[in-house]
Amino acid sequence: DHAILAEESGNQDGNDYRWIIDPLDGTTNYLHGFPQFSVSIALKYKGRLEHGLVYDPLREEMFTASRGSGAQLNDRKIRVSARKGLEGALLGTGFPYRDQRQLDAYLGMFKSLVKDTAGIRRPGSAALDLAYVAAGRHDAFWEMGLQVWDVAAGALLVQEAGGLVSDFSGGSNYLTGGEIVAGNPKCFKAVLQVTKPLL
C-alpha cells in the first residue's frame, strides 16, 4: 500500500510507502514567468526517506538520490562543495512571506550572513536550492516557513552528496518543523551558528 502527501491534493493515508510530491515547487515564479521552478518527488519507506528526485524542466536537469547510493545530476555523480567557511561562499535562502511573525528573526540571520559571504541568492524554489547545494552550486541554504513537500527530496539529495541537514537548532525536525539548514559540512556549521541564537 502506498500513501501520497502532495501540496496540491493533501494527504492520503497508506501503509509503509509514502510519496511526498510537489508537482510545482516555485508556483509564484511559474505564474509570473520567472524561470525557476521544479518538480519534487520523495519516497519514504517505514518513516525513512529512501529516494528523492528534483526535476528542472527548463534546464532539463534531473537531480536524483537513493539512500546509500549517492546523488546524481542527469546520471552524473554530484558532491557538495569543498568550501571551508563562509568567506567566499554562495548561499541560498527564501523569505518567510507566509508568516510575517518570523520576519525579524529571518532578517537578523540575513544581516549576519550577508556580510561574511560572496552573496546570497533567493531564486524561489526550495527544492532546487537544496539540489544546488547537493551539486556544489550553493555552499549552504537556509529557509523557514516550509512544508515537507518543499524539502523532502532536496534534503536526501544533500545528505547523499555528502552534506548535512538540520532544523535551525541543529535537530532532526527539518521535514515537518518548517525550517531547514543544509550545506557542505563546514558551511552548514557556520550557518547553524547564526540561526541557533536568533530563534
How does the language model describe each region?
Residues 42-130, 177-199:
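Acidic beta-strand-loop-alpha-helix segment within the catalytic core
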Residues 27, 56, 158:
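Conserved G/P- and acidic residue-centered "switch" motifs that form tight phosphate/ATP-binding loops
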Residues 135-140, 163-164:
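Alpha-to-beta junction loops
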Residues 139-148:
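Active-site neighborhoods of divalent-metal-dependent phosphate/nucleic-acid chemistry enzymes
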Residues 132-135, 155-160:
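Hydrophobic residues within well-ordered alpha-helices
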Residues 13-17, 86, 134-137, 175-177:
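A short, glycine/Asx- and small/polar-enriched loop/turn
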Residues 3, 9, 162-179, 184:
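Acidic, metal-binding active-site segment of PIN/NYN-like and related structure-specific nucleases
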Residues 1-46, 53:
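Flexible, acidic active-site loops/lids enriched in D/E/S/T/G that coordinate Mg2+ and/or position polar
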